[in-house]
């Protein structure tokens, strides 16, 4: 459910419609990317043999969501991946992990940790005002300002304007500003695995969410 939000639909790069899986050091790492949004999620796993592969995002998502709440076993083969859970078993075709784009590296210039539930409620109030016109990408974003124990979100489609303010504890003397895609902001905060607080950071051309 988490990485599915980053699955691409670019027919010229079919590998982006997949989910990258990597088993290592007692972890299973999942990645998705549409070259605009990249998502990485790690979960604890009993790894008997390390490896990596790419499988169809739509197929693996449909399989996993219909499986019972029990342990799932992944076993790699020659261009295949076997998925087993109790009495259910599937064999999927795979793509080469070597063709998967490396997850973006980033050095955060500024960060801000905020209560996720409060932020989600605020985003819901202004998100509907963001523009749906791709020709004006700046209006598809939500302006976030955190300063003096106040969070402010602003969105507009040039005809309507929505402003939402809330109080929260912030580091004294520090401020944080960013313009974040309204769709991304909304989708990230709607994830079921969202933690009590979310760290938002910026680079010169990226916004990063960590939770």
What are these regions (language model features)?
Residues 1-211:
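Structural preference for solvent-exposed beta-strand-turn elements
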């Amino acid at each position: 459910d988490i990485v599915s939000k980053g699955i691409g639909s670019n027919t010229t790069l079919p590998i982006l419609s997949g989910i990258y899986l990597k088993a290592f050091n007692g972890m299973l790492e999942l990645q998705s990317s549409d070259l605009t949004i990249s998502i990485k999620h790690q979960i604890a796993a009993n790894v008997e043999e390390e490896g990596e592969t790419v499988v169809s995002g739509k197929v693996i998502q449909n399989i996993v969501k219909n499986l019972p709440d029990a342990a799932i076993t992944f076993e790699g083969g020659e261009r295949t991946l076997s998925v087993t859970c109790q009495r259910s078993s599937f064999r999927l075709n795979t793509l080469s992990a070597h063709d998967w784009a490396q997850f973006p590296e980033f050095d955060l210039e500024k960060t801000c940790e905020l209560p996720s539930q409060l932020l989600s409620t605020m985003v819901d109030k202004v998100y509907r005002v963001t523009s749906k016109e791709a020709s004006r990408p700046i209006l598809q974003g939500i302006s976030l300002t955190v300063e003096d124990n106040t969070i402010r979100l602003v969105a507009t489609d040039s005809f309507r304007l929505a402003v939402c303010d809330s109080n929260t504890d912030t580091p004294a003397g520090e401020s944080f500003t960013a313009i974040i895609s309204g769709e991304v902001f909304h989708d990230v905060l709607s994830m079921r695995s969202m933690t009590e607080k979310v760290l938002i950071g910026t680079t010169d051309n990226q916004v990063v969410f960590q939770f």
